[in-house]
């Protein structure tokens, strides 16, 4: 493996550690002053190994910051009505401040209807239409965790956003669209590319800030990026037991000023942001 310049790597684990330390201190204060322990319930439907792993990682993070965490592990063949009932019971519980619906759900279930059923005040992932609408008018509270984590990383590394050209490759509700809104809220000029964009390279070569979230291994090559750009790689592809991002990291890092690795980049900050959300929701009940 060729040597890479470590000063160019955006260390997601270090940022996550800092965020978790802030959350832990605030959780301890909330317990001490108000007697409230923030609680997160993760709804996991079926036996998908990746989903199980993600829930485990989130539970471990809860343990590190003092948040109570539990699983609602539901069978693969659960009906939509039963899922909505499970969500409704969590909405009513006073000890649960954050609800997380681990996606994807089995194909027979309606994901959007299930997400819409979560109390917006307990929407730990920030996917509820109410919270998405708040984001569009510039109110950033419970917003999708990955874009929020990327904004935190930009701030931590002192990257100027205002007046910069930010390009997002991928237009999902989880990353692309909310990322665009958050960057616009900070006065960036934003371009969104997707599978129907005719010449993606034309956009990526002009990006001061590039966020890539497609799940296509090494989609972004060295000749597609601007000298001195800042790049966030959100994609994950598993192949022969190895994990790859959407960005050809080892070559792109030669040209960029900052790049996130995969793993160890965006992922840890996303989970730390989730912890922030559970804390925020608990603080509002105090």
UniProtKB/Swiss-Prot annotation:
Q: What GO molecular function annotation could you give as one example from this UniProt entry?
A: methylenetetrahydrofolate dehydrogenase (NADP+) activity
Enzymatic reactions = (6R)-5,10-methylene-5,6,7,8-tetrahydrofolate + NADP(+) = (6R)-5,10-methenyltetrahydrofolate + NADPH; (6R)-5,10-methenyltetrahydrofolate + H2O = (6R)-10-formyltetrahydrofolate + H(+)
Q: From which residue to which does the signal peptide run? A: none
GO terms for CC? cytosol
The reply on keyword NADP is yes
| Entry's Gene Ontology BP terms | L-histidine biosynthetic process; methionine biosynthetic process; purine nucleotide biosynthetic process; tetrahydrofolate interconversion
* Amino acids binding NADP(+): 170-172, 236
List the SUPFAM superfamilies hit by this protein, alphabetically. Aminoacid dehydrogenase-like, N-terminal domain (SSF53223), NAD(P)-binding Rossmann-fold domains (SSF51735)
EC nos: 1.5.1.5, 3.5.4.9
Q: In which pathway does it act?
A: One-carbon metabolism; tetrahydrofolate interconversion
Q: Could you tell me the keywords of this UniProt record?
A: Amino-acid biosynthesis, Histidine biosynthesis, Hydrolase, Methionine biosynthesis, Multifunctional enzyme, NADP, One-carbon metabolism, Oxidoreductase, Purine biosynthesis
- Extract the CDD domains matched here: NAD_bind_m-THF_DH_Cyclohyd
Any Pfam family from its record, for instance, is THF_DHG_CYH_C
Question: What NCBIfam families does UniProt report for this protein, alphabetically?
Answer: PRK14176.1
State the protein's purpose: Catalyzes the oxidation of 5,10-methylenetetrahydrofolate to 5,10-methenyltetrahydrofolate and then the hydrolysis of 5,10-methenyltetrahydrofolate to 10-formyltetrahydrofolate.
| Subunit | Homodimer.
Which family does the entry's similarity section mention? Belongs to the tetrahydrofolate dehydrogenase/cyclohydrolase family.
| HAMAP family reported for this sequence | THF_DHG_CYH (MF_01576)
What is the official name of this protein in its record?
Answer: Bifunctional protein FolD
**Organism of provenance:** Methanococcoides burtonii (strain DSM 6242 / NBRC 107633 / OCM 468 / ACE-M)
Q: Which gene specifies this protein's sequence?
A: folD
């Amino acid at each position: 493996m060729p040597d890479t310049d470590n000063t160019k790597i955006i260390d997601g684990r270090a940022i996550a550690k800092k965020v978790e330390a802030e959350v832990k201190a605030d959780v301890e204060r909330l317990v001490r002053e108000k007697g409230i322990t923030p609680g997160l319930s993760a709804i996991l439907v079926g036996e998908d190994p990746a989903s199980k792993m993600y829930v485990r990682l989130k539970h471990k993070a809860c343990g590190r910051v003092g948040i109570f965490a539990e699983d609602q592990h539901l069978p693969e063949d659960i009906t939509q009505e039963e899922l909505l009932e499970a969500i409704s019971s969590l909405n009513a519980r006073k000890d649960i401040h954050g609800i997380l619906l681990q996606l994807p759900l089995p194909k027979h279930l309606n994901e959007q209807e299930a997400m819409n059923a979560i109390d917006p005040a307990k929407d730990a992932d920030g996917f509820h239409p109410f919270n998405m609408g708040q984001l569009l008018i510039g109110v950033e509270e419970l917003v999708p965790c990955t874009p929020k984590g990327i904004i935190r990383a930009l701030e931590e590394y002192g990257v100027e956003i205002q007046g910069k050209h930010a390009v997002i490759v991928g237009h999902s509700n989880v990353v692309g669209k909310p990322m665009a809104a958050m960057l616009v809220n900070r006065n960036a000029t934003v371009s969104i590319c997707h599978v129907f964009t005719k010449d993606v390279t034309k956009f990526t070569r002009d990006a001061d800030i590039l966020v890539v979230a497609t799940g296509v291994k090494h989609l972004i090559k060295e000749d597609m990026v601007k000298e001195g750009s800042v790049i966030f790689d959100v994609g994950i592809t598993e192949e022969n037991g190895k994990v790859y991002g959407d960005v050809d990291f080892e070559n792109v890092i030669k040209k960029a000023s900052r790049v996130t690795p995969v793993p160890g980049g965006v992922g840890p900050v996303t989970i730390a942001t989730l912890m922030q959300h559970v804390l925020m929701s608990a603080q509002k009940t105090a």
